[in-house]
């Protein structure tokens, strides 16, 4: 039986075996990525790598990278819903992470749409009271509907997830995580353009 196996391997050829092995790795990785359960943390993407984060997979990955942030975190979000009644609300946890990072000296800045100020003023109050710089976009006539997080000038989360409990745990939402300093620079420039023309929330 062993001799038969060796003969088969010889017949297939090393190149074909390597190709099959690599194909197996790719298929295995794809399956693991796309059937991962809610909140599953994927390993860091290679430079230029892209991860698809559907539904609640976004939250686990975002917290993974926020926990490792040491330089900067820039957030642009249409709606951020802080709810002081529920400490374990996933949005509350994200905001606490931002506050903790800011107090450690990380450059944390947040831009939200007026809808956050109107519907969820506790969000603004919590961030401002803890010193985190927050701005609204340049005019009430402008809607900031983007949902972006840029971490350490390298990791970009961009997609449909607002920071609400529903978006993070229930809704069908999609976001891409891109590991690219080049893209991060472009998106940071976009963030800075909104930030520089933004309004204080008070």
Show where each model-derived region lies.
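Secretory targeting signatures
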Residues: 1-39
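N-terminal, intrinsically disordered, polar/charged segments of Gram-positive cell-envelope systems
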Residues: 37-50
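Short, flexible loop segments at the rims of nucleotide/cofactor-binding pockets, characterized by
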Residues: 49-55, 85-87, 134-136
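Short acidic active-site motifs
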Residues: 61
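Primarily the HKD phosphodiesterase
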Residues: 65-132
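Solvent-exposed loop/turn segments at secondary-structure junctions
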Residues: 79-83, 114-118, 139-143, 155-156, ...
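Signature of lipid phosphatidyltransferase scaffolds
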Residues: 151, 155-202
């Amino acid at each position: 039986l062993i001799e038969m196996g060796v003969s088969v391997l010889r017949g297939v050829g090393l190149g074909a075996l390597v190709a099959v092995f690599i194909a197996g790795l790719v298929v295995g990785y794809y399956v693991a990525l796309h059937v991962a359960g809610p909140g599953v943390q994927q390993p860091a993407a290679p430079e230029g790598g892209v991860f698809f984060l559907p539904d609640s997979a976004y939250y686990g990955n975002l917290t993974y990278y926020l926990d490792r942030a040491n330089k900067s975190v820039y957030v642009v979000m249409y709606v951020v819903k802080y709810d002081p009644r529920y400490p374990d609300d996933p949005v509350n946890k994200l905001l606490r992470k931002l506050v903790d990072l800011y107090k450690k000296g990380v450059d944390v800045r947040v831009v939200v749409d007026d809808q956050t100020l109107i519907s969820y003023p506790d969000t603004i109050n919590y961030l401002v009271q803890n010193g985190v710089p927050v701005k609204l976009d340049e005019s009430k006539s402008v809607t900031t509907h983007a949902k972006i997080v840029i971490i350490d000038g390298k990791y970009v989360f961009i997609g449909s997830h607002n920071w609400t409990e529903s978006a993070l745990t229930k809704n069908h939402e999609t976001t891409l995580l891109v590991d690219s300093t080049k893209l991060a620079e472009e998106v940071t420039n976009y963030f800075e353009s909104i930030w520089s023309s933004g309004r204080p929330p008070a």
